[in-house]
């Protein structure tokens, strides 16, 4: 059903997950759960569900969306986008879009933010960068859960790498040749 919502253009995969986590208070959204279980296994479950959705004329009343079929066929996890970029009239708005975690910075967000900043800095038609955060917070800071998980798993090198990469991204924002504004 989550895949059908995305397939019908109701909202994005990230929005479906966010809605489940915020609205239903799930620990993980449906697409995150599919990644955890495995997209292939999730697809097999969806096929079983589809077989239960038979009308009187033996035709299915629900079908698995093509993009879910292709994802399962490739046997790859879903990729989530937590940084959105829009460019209008030379102004690039980069929105950190992880409001369910107060836009806290984790590895994925920092990497995606770095890619977005690099792209708009290289874009000659952009003269201004506006940084924004979706939801109630601009950015809550680093995701503390990341640090706790890495300390518990004795992965201190991951913390050092994350911190180093975070500094590089923040320095690229600070040293941008573009006018840079943060909306808080």
Residue ranges and their predicted role:
Residues 141-148:
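Short, flexible, mixed-charge acidic loops at enzyme active sites
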């Amino acid at each position: 059903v989550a895949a059908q919502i995305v397939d019908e253009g109701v909202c994005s995969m990230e929005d479906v997950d966010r809605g489940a986590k915020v609205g239903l208070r799930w620990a993980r959204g449906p697409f995150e759960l599919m990644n955890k279980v495995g997209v292939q296994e999730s697809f097999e479950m969806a096929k079983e569900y589809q077989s239960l959705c038979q009308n009187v004329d033996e035709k299915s009343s629900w079908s698995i969306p093509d993009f879910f079929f292709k994802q399962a066929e490739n046997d790859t996890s879903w990729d989530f986008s937590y940084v959105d970029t829009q460019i209008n009239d030379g102004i690039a708005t980069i929105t950190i879009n992880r409001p369910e975690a107060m836009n806290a910075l984790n590895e994925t967000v920092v990497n995606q933010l770095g890619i977005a900043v690099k792209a708009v800095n290289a874009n000659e038609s952009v003269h201004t960068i506006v940084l924004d955060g979706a939801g109630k917070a601009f950015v809550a800071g680093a995701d503390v859960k990341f640090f706790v998980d890495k300390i518990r798993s004795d992965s201190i090198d991951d913390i050092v790498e994350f911190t180093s990469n975070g500094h590089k991204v923040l320095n690229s924002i600070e040293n941008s040749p573009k006018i840079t504004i943060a909306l808080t």
